[in-house]
């Protein structure tokens, strides 16, 4: 009996110790301090507004009138109807809180000064980002529909379509990493890296050692990381450590615990450019879980593409724009110093048409979503889609359902093990309507699917960073590669079909048999999805 009591006592001590460890980890986490600081500010603002409203009946009436005027203003804005509905409901249900939240978080445009700097850089580089007439004519003669899709990207995103480029597709980060290391080691003139998340570990330390060596050799090594994406993964002022190693480094929109709408806009892009003619992009960040060196949410399924050739120029210009804007440089960029042919002898191989592009919250154009919609609307046989999050607006829902009802084989693959449970519940709330229209949905059972890709009709595809959710489509800086009649199209399709073997196909009964409480919660989340 005494031994049994000692065992129970020991288990209790271990449980208490574990609880204290978790509590200490939370308290000393930077996210904890940021969250507390922001909640205190929001609480203080709300308390002041409520006190004013309680102090005077006229102030209370005035605040409610402001809410009504604000609703009318929102309804007449040229924004996505889903945003209009979400904000209108919030303001009408909770007038005072809704008004406060809208003025703090509601406007999606980035800071005016940043917008001005981007527009200046885009205008400055215009002459270096023109379609080659012979390339455009060739694509037009080959497929007018594909040419129209490409022309939209050229005209709106400002990045031209290219030939003289090859592509290699990677089914998982485990395959991409050794190739990335090999190419980095061969760098002669410059390495430009821009990522949303960097985390210390096998992947980053391997890359960092190469970057340090290359910087010592005189290679121009530059790095951009996102202030929020790396909030918990890198030390405070990590850029100073890198600069001591000879690596030029800038932080996009450093995250500060201040209520500010600008904090909504993040740099979600993932770019690695080497000597102007080798470029990587896709869903893979620089952290061990992306190459399955660390287990998080089961097996991590992600994809990437490596380009070699003239199309890498688009990526280089994207990076140079971002670098100049973050640094608030007033000097003109010497674009000719970074041309692809400058550091590559001979001609590039050519395989189809390749067009890297970016999407920004700088304007009212949702380039990423429009590129996806173009593919769906023009599909004749099939569209296969990979996305970690499925939180879509009415336009995307209508396009997917219409394509399926028109006989197009529409398949969507999502994670089986989520990284964010709330977002996963919201993702699953869209299943029923899609299934009823004939869309097939698959959940990747071994773990977390983080890939973002479209492929259609054995001819056209996109690989990049753009998720099917509101944050990616409306608030973040993103990038992708539009690909036409390149051999990687077949690779993307084959990967999707092979991955289906590890998926569970979702049947209509899955949605119908969910408990009523969960379905009510999903409906509430759906109403406010654009704000999440």
Residue ranges and their predicted role:
Residues 440:
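Surface segments flanking catalytic/ligand-binding clefts of nucleic-acid enzymes
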Residues 386-387, 414, 444, 463-464:
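Thr-Gly-centered strand-to-loop micro-motif
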Residues 452:
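Catalytic-core elements of nucleic-acid end-processing and repair enzymes
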Residues 398, 424-428:
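Short glycine/threonine-rich loop-to-helix capping motif typified by GTGT followed
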Residues 196, 389, 423:
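Glycine- and other small-residue-rich loops at beta-strand/loop junctions that grip anionic moieties
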Residues 379, 389-410, 415, 420:
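Helical hairpin unit composed of two closely spaced alpha helices linked by a short loop
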Residues 1-370, 374, 378, 418, ...:
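N-terminal localization/anchoring segments of enzymes in phospholipid and broader phosphate metabolism
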């Amino acid at each position: 009996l005494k031994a049994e009591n000692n065992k129970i006592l020991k288990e209790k001590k271990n449980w208490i110790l574990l609880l204290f460890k978790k509590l200490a980890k939370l308290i000393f986490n930077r996210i904890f301090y940021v969250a507390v600081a922001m909640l205190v500010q929001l609480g203080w603002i709300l308390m002041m507004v409520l006190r004013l409203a309680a102090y005077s009946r006229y102030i209370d009436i005035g605040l409610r009138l402001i809410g009504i005027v604000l609703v009318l203003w929102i309804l007449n804005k040229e924004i996505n109807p889903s945003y209009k509905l979400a904000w209108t409901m919030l303001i009408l249900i909770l007038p005072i809180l809704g008004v406060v939240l809208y003025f703090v978080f509601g406007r999606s445009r980035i800071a005016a000064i940043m917008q001005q700097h981007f527009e200046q850089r885009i205008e400055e580089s215009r002459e270096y980002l023109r379609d080659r007439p012979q390339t455009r004519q060739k694509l037009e003669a080959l497929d007018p529909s594909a040419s129209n899709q490409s022309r939209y990207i050229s005209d709106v995103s400002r990045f031209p379509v290219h030939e003289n480029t090859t592509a290699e597709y990677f089914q998982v980060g485990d395959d991409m990493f050794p190739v990335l290391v090999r190419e980095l080691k061969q760098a002669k003139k410059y390495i430009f890296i821009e990522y949303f998340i960097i985390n210390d570990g096998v992947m980053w330390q391997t890359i960092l050692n190469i970057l340090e060596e290359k910087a010592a050799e005189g290679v121009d090594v530059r790095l951009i990381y996102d202030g929020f994406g790396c909030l918990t993964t890198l030390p405070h002022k990590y850029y100073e450590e890198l600069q001591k190693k000879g690596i030029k480094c800038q932080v996009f929109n450093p995250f500060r615990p201040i209520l500010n709408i600008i904090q909504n806009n993040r740099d979600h892009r993932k770019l690695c450019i080497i000597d102007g003619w080798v470029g990587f992009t896709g869903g893979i960040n620089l952290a061990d879980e992306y190459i399955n060196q660390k287990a998080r949410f089961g097996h991590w399924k992600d994809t990437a593409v490596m380009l070699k050739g003239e199309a890498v120029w688009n990526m280089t210009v994207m990076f140079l724009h971002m670098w100049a804007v973050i640094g608030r440089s007033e000097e003109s960029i010497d674009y000719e110093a970074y041309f692809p042919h400058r550091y590559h002898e001979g001609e590039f191989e050519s395989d189809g048409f390749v067009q890297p592009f970016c999407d920004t919250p700088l304007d009212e154009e949702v380039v990423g979503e429009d590129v996806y919609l173009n593919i769906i609307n023009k599909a004749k046989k099939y569209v296969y889609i990979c996305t970690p999050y499925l939180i879509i607006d009415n336009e995307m829902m209508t396009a997917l359902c219409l394509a399926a009802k028109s006989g197009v084989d529409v398949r969507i693959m999502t994670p089986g093990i989520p990284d964010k449970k709330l977002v996963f519940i919201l993702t699953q709330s869209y299943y029923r309507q899609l299934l009823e229209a004939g869309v097939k949905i698959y959940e990747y059972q071994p773990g977390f699917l983080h890939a973002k890709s479209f492929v259609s009709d054995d001819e056209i595809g996109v690989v990049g960073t753009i998720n099917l959710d509101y944050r990616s489509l409306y608030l973040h800086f993103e990038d992708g590669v539009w690909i036409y009649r390149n051999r990687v199209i077949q690779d993307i399709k084959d990967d999707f079909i092979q991955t289906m073997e590890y998926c569970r196909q979702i049947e209509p009964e899955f949605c119908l048999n969910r408990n009523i409480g969960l379905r009510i919660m999903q409906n509430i989340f759906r109403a406010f999805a654009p704000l999440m």
